[in-house]
Amino acid sequence: MKVFVAICVLIGLASADYVVKNRHDMLAYRDECVKELAVPVDLVEKYQKWEYPNDAKTQCYIKCVFTKWGLFDVQSGFNVENIHQQLVGNHADHNEAFHASLAACVDKNEQGSNACEWAYRGATCLLKENLAQIQKSLAPKA
């Protein structure tokens, strides 16, 4: 039992560093990445519709946004704990099935892809499997 409590405390401490972002943060990160990468208007319009074509500019845009969110790091990849916390909020119960579905979308880049391709690969899976939850977490608050 003590081991279980210790593990729970460690998980809590590890995820305590992440601050859940809001819609304002998302819009700011999008704008920053569009400017940093000189993303053309036609692609920005697609991104606003949650459409992310598989091209180099979009891949690097995805990496940029997920990095700014604290959800992706070029050395270690996706942080599933942070993604889970972002989608369910700070005070939600930790749902193991949902966590496992998120973890299934990420890899350790065994393929040796560049960071942009790696981020895109994981993000497109996360979007495909969890779009409604992602949109809900970023919806304007009434």
Curated annotation (Swiss-Prot):
Molecular functions per Gene Ontology: odorant binding
Known tissue expression: Expressed in larval chemosensory organ. Specifically expressed exclusively in a subset of chemosensory sensilla on the third antennal segment.
Residues of the signal peptide: 1-16
Primary localization class, coarse: secreted
Domain of life: Eukaryota
Cellular compartment(s): Secreted
SUPFAM superfamilies on file: Insect pheromone/odorant-binding proteins (SSF47565)
Record's function text: Present in the aqueous fluid surrounding olfactory sensory dendrites and are thought to aid in the capture and transport of hydrophobic odorants into and through this fluid.
Family recorded in the similarity comment: Belongs to the PBP/GOBP family.
Protein name: General odorant-binding protein 99a
Organism: Drosophila melanogaster
Gene of this entry: Obp99a
